Amino acid sequence: SLEFGSHVQTKRRMLTEIAATLAFSAIQNNDKIGVIFFSDRIEKFIPPKKGRKHILYIIRELLEFKPESNRTDVGCAVEYLTSVIKRRCTAFLLSDFIDDKDFRQPLTIANRKHDVVAVQVYDRRVAE
């Protein structure tokens, strides 16, 4: 569903721009950044690191990533985050949240350990 969007910008591109903005903000704060690519399963994990070179690698991966599935399971991604990231972090969950299973319980558990900020990207035309 991320390929849907207006003729000006797809949701995928919008998510990539948001992620890039957050990544460059992380550089300014000397923070680590990593990415979990997911569909209805974990497709790729880039562990958190610092540095401009790492951020550029992440952005390149964001631009080139093609999910194997067109389904979404946010709960799976949140559970994975909780299992692989041991130290408390701020995690931005970027998704359109369409076709998701109920992910409230995994999100509640993740929020006990991390500060999870959900960012929903949508296109008004989907609702029309």
Positions of predicted regions on the chain:
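Exposed, interaction-prone extracellular/peripheral surfaces
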Residues: 1-128
